[in-house]
């Protein structure tokens, strides 16, 4: 029981959350937008605003890209070699390293790096939610959103915005769509279709060797994704979102393509992921729609396979991987940033070519802009404490639990 409690706390940071929950926060209180006297196209935004309601913001774009967004299960920068920002002698993610170097990687250091772990973002459905909505998922919810009728009905998400702009949207996962309310999160916020293990079994020939205990192995998922994308791309502008699974705790899932050259099982699975993802990106590059498609790769959370991160030095900051391919905007402010998964929301839209009034959506800040993120402005400890407190605004207007 004691070990179970320790694991639960390490996964959801629930002890600190409970201690703060009796207090209330004012960070979601309506802030008056202040605009400097500059041309509209030059306005960067107000860095003092913590929360910006996306429903009150003008988001526009006439020549925006398609989107491929891939949540990478448990992919963190720790498994890079020391030369590139990890702790390993041999790089477990060589292909992903090169992709990050050749494209845009936002980093917390002057090497490759990524988003900092943050309350309400550090397990899969919470990570998806934070990147999708710019808000943390309430810790006490954990994976129980399948018990709710609606998934944050008051939130305006990436899916809602792309739906308003005529995008056809599909989520493809190798597990069951109902787990943790994944189906509700996406289908209730602009998505047209979810392809999961059950629907894929009906549509394609799936062999037993293609399966693990969660559902479809990633090599098969990427194989079938090519078919889904080919069909989707013929319908107009699209958002194709995926989530991998092979690096899931407690020890990951080996497949027939995994090498046996690294120190342990998990590192071999990591190396396999790097090759699979890179191969999929290479396929994308050969398609007619590639030049008009932004691809975003993001680790969903640091791994929970604790036995494989016991060697992490106490002074090393674990972060999740990110890479923006074919972004329509650039920035020279990519290194030594302090940001969370909530910042992926406006940053992704900006990468696609959308103009975001004030560069802030929910608790997220567009990393391509000149604005500091909320944790750069106010400090991670302060913002972390505030989001753990109760908020009548969020409960009434965003979460609206049963």
Model feature map: region roles:
Residues 1-25:
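Transmembrane and membrane-interface helices of multi-pass
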Residues 19, 23-56:
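Short coil-to-helix leader/linker segments, especially the first N-terminal amphipathic alpha-helix
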Residues 46-402:
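Solvent-exposed soluble domains appended to multi-pass membrane proteins
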């Amino acid at each position: 029981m004691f070990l179970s409690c320790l694991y639960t706390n390490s996964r959801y940071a629930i002890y600190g959350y409970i201690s703060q929950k009796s207090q209330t926060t004012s960070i979601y209180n309506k802030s008056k937008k202040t605009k400097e006297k500059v041309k509209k196209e030059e306005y960067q935004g107000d860095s003092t605003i913590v929360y910006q309601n996306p429903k009150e913001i003008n988001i526009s774009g006439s020549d925006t890209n398609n989107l491929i967004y891939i949540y990478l299960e448990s992919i963190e920068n720790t498994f890079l070699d020391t030369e590139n920002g990890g702790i390993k002698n041999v790089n477990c993610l060589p292909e992903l390293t090169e992709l990050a170097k050749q494209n845009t990687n936002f980093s917390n250091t002057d090497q490759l790096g990524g988003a900092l772990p943050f309350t309400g973002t550090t397990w899969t459905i919470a990570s998806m939610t934070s990147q999708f909505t710019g808000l943390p998922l309430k810790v006490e919810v954990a994976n129980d959103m399948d018990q709710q009728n609606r998934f944050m009905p008051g939130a305006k998400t990436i899916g809602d915005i792309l739906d308003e702009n005529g995008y056809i949207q599909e989520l493809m996962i190798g597990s069951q769509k109902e787990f943790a309310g994944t189906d509700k999160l996406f289908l209730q916020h602009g998505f047209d279709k979810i392809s999961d293990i059950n629907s894929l079994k009906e549509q394609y020939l799936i062999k037993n060797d293609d399966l693990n205990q969660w559902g479809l192995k990633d090599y098969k998922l990427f194989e079938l994704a090519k078919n889904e994308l080919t069909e989707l791309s013929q319908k107009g502008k699209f958002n194709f979102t995926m989530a991998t699974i092979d690096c899931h705790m407690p020890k990951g899932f080996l497949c027939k393509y995994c090498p046996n050259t690294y120190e342990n099982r998990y590192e071999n699975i990591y190396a396999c992921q790097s090759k699979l993802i890179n191969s999929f990106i290479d396929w994308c590059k050969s398609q007619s729609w590639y030049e008009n498609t932004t691809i975003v790769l993001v680790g969903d959370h640091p791994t929970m396979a604790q036995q494989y991160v016991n060697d992490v030095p106490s002074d090393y900051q674990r972060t999740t991987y990110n890479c923006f391919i074919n972004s329509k905007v650039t920035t020279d402010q990519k290194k030594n940033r302090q940001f969370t998964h909530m910042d992926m929301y406006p940053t992704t839209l900006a990468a696609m070519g959308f103009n975001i009034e004030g560069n802030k959506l929910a608790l997220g800040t567009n990393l391509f802009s000149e604005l500091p993120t909320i944790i750069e402005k106010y400090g991670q400890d302060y913002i972390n404490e505030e989001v753990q407190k109760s908020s009548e605004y969020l409960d009434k207007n965003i979460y609206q639990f049963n």
